[in-house]
Amino acid sequence: MLAKRIIPCLDVREGRVVKGINFEDLRDAGSILEQARFYNNELADELVFLDISASLESRKTTLEEVLKVSEEVFIPLTVGGGISSVERARDAFLHGADKVSVNTAAVYDPKLITRIADQYGSQAVVVAIDVKKVGEKYIVHTHSGKELTKYEALEWARMVQELGAGEILLTSMDRDGTKAGYDNEILREISTSVHIPVIASGGAGNLEHLYDGFAKGCADAALAASIFHFRQYTIREAKEYLRERGIEVRL
């Protein structure tokens, strides 16, 4: 069995790490480089850098910051936000990204996933799926959660797999920043319906939530921000807790 991964996420806006609740009410969470260095030394398996306003503002990811982070960390770095073309993906790779995360642009141009995967390999393409419950259905949203799409979450997850995605980053907008735990219902539904890895995101508030994401949600990796940014827990503490409960992790 592959080891489960713990992945801190740097949501970046205007040169700082920020964290919000339900994609709103952002508060400062520190220096980008300080947080990146901390996680590099803290047994993080990977690091995600998301320029959270790039797609909303129709601009490129802040590549200068990406380059600085890539020079400081020696774990896989995923970069997202404003990756709307193969050229922008290439720029991210040239600035040190190991993977790119596509979200809004892929919904409006699904073949973008294929074009990037054909050039750089599926292993380098993460499709971020932001979902929110609308009635009884989980609906995909874009533009940092501002716009509702025609896709149901499972339908879109299966599509991106066929288009060449190597991984799915599944975020529950309803749970984001609430510390109420991952939405293990949709997480499990998607994780057990696709054969590519699924990263749980949105809602981690304690170590049991991480465990539940793996044990109940069947996730391959758990992404978290608040609990690590504000030093509620260290990644080592999280991994030791998971190992004690029978989850295989790298320590």
Curated annotation (Swiss-Prot):
Biological process per Gene Ontology, one example term: L-histidine biosynthetic process
Coiled-coil blocks: none
SUPFAM superfamilies: Ribulose-phoshate binding barrel
Enzyme Commission numbers on file: 4.3.2.10
Xref: InterPro entries: Aldolase_TIM, His_biosynth, HisF, IGPS_HisA/HisF, RibuloseP-bd_barrel
Domain of life of the native organism: Bacteria
Function: IGPS catalyzes the conversion of PRFAR and glutamine to IGP, AICAR and glutamate. The HisF subunit catalyzes the cyclization activity that produces IGP and AICAR from PRFAR using the ammonia provided by the HisH subunit.
The name this protein goes by in its record: Imidazole glycerol phosphate synthase subunit HisF
Originating organism: Chlorobium phaeobacteroides (strain BS1)
Native organism taxonomy: Bacteria, Pseudomonadati, Chlorobiota, Chlorobiia, Chlorobiales
